[in-house]
Amino acid sequence: MNISRLPLLVCAVLVYWLVAAVAPPVTPTASPAAPQSDMAETDTAKNKSASQSAPKTSKKPKRAAGLLYGIAKAPAKAAGTIRLGAYNIENLFDGVDDPSLSGEYDDIKMQTSEDRCKSLAKAIHDLDADVLCLEEVEGEDALRWFRDTYLKDMGYEFLASKEVGYYRGVEQSLLSRFPIKDVQIWTTEDLAPMEKYIPKDTDQRKKEGWGDDPKVKEPLKFQRSPLKATIDLPSGQELTIYVVHHKAGGKATAHHRELESLRMNEMVKADLAKNPDAFVAVVGDLNATPMEKAAKLYRDKDFAGLVSAYEFRPEAGQAKEKKSAAPDATDSSAQADGSADANADESDAKSDATSKADAKSKAAEKLAAKNLYLTHITNRSIDYILLSPALVKIAVPKSFFVFGTLMPGSDYDYKKDQPPAGYASDHCPIAIDLKSAATNSAKPKTDAATPPAAKEVAK
C-alpha cells in the first residue's frame, strides 16, 4: 500500500461518516419488487381471508350432486299386490316449537325446509308404498302435518308415531292405507341380558364377528325404541311390523347395535313361536351393512331366521357369468412367417386398447350394479326390509328396489352447507311388493291440511 495516500483515505472515511449521520433515515420498502397497487393488495387480502374462513371451492368435487344410487324410476305395482316401503327421511321437523327441545337440538332450528319437504313428498309419491315405515320423524303432529300438507292424494288415512325419548327428538313412524292397531314401544328396555349370547373370550368374539367388548359397561337400552304395529290387510290377514332405527356410529358402537339386534330377534322369535305362519317384518335403518353382525343376526336361523328383501332384487339368484378366455393379441402364431408386420402391430395396439376399454366398461357396470342397492350417502346398504317365512312365500320375485333420490356432491359438509335444491334425505327409500288376495287400489284423500297443534313439554 502507498503510505502517502493514507491521509486521503482517512479523510474520505470521515466525510462519509459525517454525511450518513446528518442525512434523514431511509425507510426500507416492504419488498425489493415494485410496490403493489391498491387493487392488488385488496385482492391479496380477500384471497387470504377467503382461504381462512370460506369453504374450499377452488377444486372441483370428485363427485357431483346427482342420482348416485338406486333406480331413477320406481316400477309400477302389479295388480293384486301390496307395496311395503321404508324411508329414513332425515329429521322431519315441523315449524311448531317443542319446549322440551332446546340449545343444539332446538326443533325450531331443525325445521325442515319447504324444498326438502317437497322433495321428500315427491320421493314418497314415486315410491307409492301402501305401507310406509319412516325413521327420523319429530312426532305424530309433525307427521300428520306433513301428510296433510304434502301427501293429501296418497291415501294414507292411517298413521302411527310414538315419543321414544331420544335426545334429538326423532322417532319411528308409520303411514298406511290400511288400518293400524296395537302400537307399542320399549323406551326402558334393559339390553344387558342380551350379553348372554355374546362370547366372553376376545378371540372368539372376533372370530364370530362381534364388536369389541366395551371397557366401561354402561346400562344400555334402545337408542331409539322400535315401533311395533299391526296392519289389517285387505285380505283379512294381519301384518306385524317392527320399525327400527339402530344406534348409529362405527366400530365403537357396534356392541350397542348388536344388543339392540339381539333383543329385536328375541321379540320376532317369540312372535313366530306363537304363530309360525305369521306375517312379520322388521323394517328400517340398521346402521349396519349386510355382513356386519347386527344385520346378520336377523338372517341367522338360530335367531329370527328372517330373509332380506335384497334376495328379491332382479339380479338375485342369477347364475354368475362364466369368464371367457380372451384371445391373446400377441400370439406369434398369428404371423405365418414370424416377421414383424406393421399391420399386426397396429392390430395388437387396437386389441390392447379394446381390452382395456372392455375392462373399464365391465368395472363401471359392476360399480353401477352395486350402486343400485346402496341406500346411504356413505356408500353403504344400511336400510332393510326383513321378512318372516310366511311373507317370503308371498313376496313378488324381483320386486325389491332402491329408489334413487338426489345426493349432494362429495364436497358437501352437512354440518355447514345447505343441501342442493331437490335434496330429500341422506337415505334412499326401498320397497318390495307382496301378493295379496285382495288389495285396496283406491287412494282415498285425507282431510285438508290442518296446522299442527302446539306441542306440550311432555309429549
Regions found by a protein language model. Give the residues of each.
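A well-ordered secondary-structure block
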Residues: L174-P234
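Bacterial N-terminal signal peptides
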Residues: L9-A20
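N-terminal, active-site-proximal structural segment of metallo-dependent hydrolase catalytic domains
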Residues: N2-P7, P28-T149, D153, A160-E171, ...
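A long, amphipathic alpha-helix that forms part
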Residues: A254-P276
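Active-site metal-binding loops of divalent metal-dependent hydrolases
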Residues: I89-L92, V137, H246, G284-L286, ...
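Active-site environment of divalent metal-dependent phosphoester hydrolases
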Residues: G139-D141, Y167-G169, G249-G250, N287-K293, ...
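Metal-dependent phosphoester-hydrolase catalytic domains
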Residues: Q36-K48, A54-A74, V268-A281, A288-K459
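Beta-strand-turn-beta hairpins that frame and shape the catalytic cleft
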Residues: A76-L84, F93, P214-K217, K221-H246
